[in-house]
Amino acid sequence: MKRKFILFLAFMAASVAVMAQNPLPNDPEVKVGKLENGLTYYIRHNDKPAQRAEFYLATNVGAFQETDEQDGLAHFLEHMCFNGTKNFPGKDLLNWLQSIGAEFGRNINASTGFEETQYMLNNIPIVREGIVDSCLLALHDYSHFVSCLPEEIDAERGVILEERRTRRDANWRMFEKALPYYYGDTPYAKRTLIGSEEQLKNFEYHCLTDFYRKWYNPDMQAVVVVGDVDVNQIEEKIRKTFSDIPAPAVPTEKVMYPIPANEEPIVAVLTDPEATGSNISILWKMDPLPEQMNNTDVAYMLSLAKYQIQLIMSERFSDITSQPDSPFLGAGFGIGNLCETCDAASGNVSFKPGMAKEAFSAFMIQIEKMKKIWFH
């Protein structure tokens, strides 16, 4: 049975039921708009520090949108954005950004997740207008005009294979083994973010470009600019720079798969010869808050409750860990999302050698206390 791990949130259920689901007011200092092609933008002035700005492209797509032949290519595509675009061939973009004092990794970066990909130009010194124009042009090219030249793809294979080699330590390998237990028989269980060695060595070029053309469309993207800028001027620049990106003839639907319920607890023992410690991970699956309730006062109240739960449990487990007879080395508790279709409360216990049963029991006693007596 898919358990509803209500926790302290149940204490607030009566209030939630009678509250009007009023939308939270937007920050009046944030200018929000949408171009005809579907691209959304957010702009806010912030002059601390002066003459600095942040530029982001958020894309509502990640590894979960890959097909089997595209495993790892959402992340691979992120790398290709730094290897040649329409207006910045080869390494021109990186070279230019470094020429104005930006550093790769610190000011220039990107991140690929299971359900989203973000490109960031952070803390950029905007000492002249042309720098703003070029940063927006870089996001424009990431959005729809990455070159993905065969020779650049082949050159990047080795880079990502080395990243994979260093990333896949014992914890990562056990995480990959755990995916089917988290996500059941859904496509989510097959996605590893970085892909297999064989896949990275041998995928055909079109697999990467097919993913890019299908998913990197303006209706799936947002541009964010925050910094010491004139908001109206930035809005005009965004409209001028991004309006040439074509809207898809048929918008691509982002399919989301429900995580199957289970009648009995799912138990797995996962090992790795290079593991340096032992721990117990526990998940309680929950239905997510309905999308229409996001950005409402109810959602905000629940987020505060979750934060307080996690804070209280963190302090409680810290106190227990500090005791000399504690069966575990550390423990944690959190409430978040497993994917867009499933939220989860999660616990993690690192236990002393030979004390798995005692550590699990001590952890669950605290969970039951939390549920039954509301932290008193």
Features from the language model and the residues they span:
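Bacterial Sec-dependent N-terminal signal peptides
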Residues: 1-22
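Histidine-acidic residue clusters that define the catalytic metal-binding segment
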Residues: 22-31, 119-123, 129, 137, ...
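Mature N-terminal segment immediately following signal peptide/propeptide cleavage
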Residues: 23-57
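Active-site-adjacent, His/Asp/Glu-enriched structural segments that form or flank metal-binding
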Residues: 51, 59-173, 192, 202, ...
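A structural supersecondary motif
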Residues: 103-107, 283, 310-350
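An aromatic/glycine/proline-enriched structural segment found at the starts
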Residues: 222-278, 374
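His/Glu-based metal-binding/catalytic segments typifying zinc-dependent metallopeptidases
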Residues: 251-317, 348
